[in-house]
A protein has these predicted regions:
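HotDog/MaoC-like acyl-thioester-processing domains
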Residues: 1-17, 95-146
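Short, intrinsically disordered, mixed-charge
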Residues: 35-39, 74-78, 125
Length: 146
């Protein structure tokens, strides 16, 4: 993972704003995700079994890449104080052990009255999209005394 915790208030956001972070997937990350999610599908955990699948080897859980989106939303854009309320996802390609996943979120709409911010979410490996979708968050408002 790269990047320090940042963040912005609703009033500081504009359509087109974006943030990105990179995450390198290790076998330990997949094993830990399997432990916390209870998703122990052998395609993620058993190399011999995974070799018999169309993927021809272990792959990361799709939701691990989705968790990386959550990290960017919660740490950077909008950042701390935001609430993740929805996400659509399309998994385009597998993510493998050793891959570096570059996650970018971009503001596509802002509803000031409700503080709802809609963002496009894209995860890429070597410039190829592995996952994309759209997220909605409630962004924190600036303090009245600021």
């Amino acid at each position: 993972m790269s990047g320090a915790v940042a963040g912005r208030f609703l009033e500081q956001l504009a359509v087109g704003d974006s943030a990105a972070r990179s995450f390198t997937v290790g076998a330990a990350d997949i094993d830990a995700f399997a432990a916390v999610s209870h998703d122990r599908n052998p395609v993620h955990l058993d190399e011999a079994c995974a070799q018999t699948t169309p993927f021809k080897g272990r792959i990361a859980h799709g939701m691990l890449s989705a968790a990386y989106v959550s990290a960017v939303l919660g740490n950077d854009l909008p950042g701390p104080g935001s609430a993740y309320v929805s996400q659509s996802l399309r998994f385009r390609r597998p993510v493998r052990i050793g891959d570096t996943v570059e996650v970018t979120v971009t503001v596509v709409a802002i509803e000031p009255r409700t503080a709802k911010v809609t963002l496009s979410t894209v995860a890429k490996v070597d410039g190829k999209t592995v996952m994309d979708g759209e997220a909605a968050v409630l962004a924190p408002r600036a303090p009245k005394d600021a």
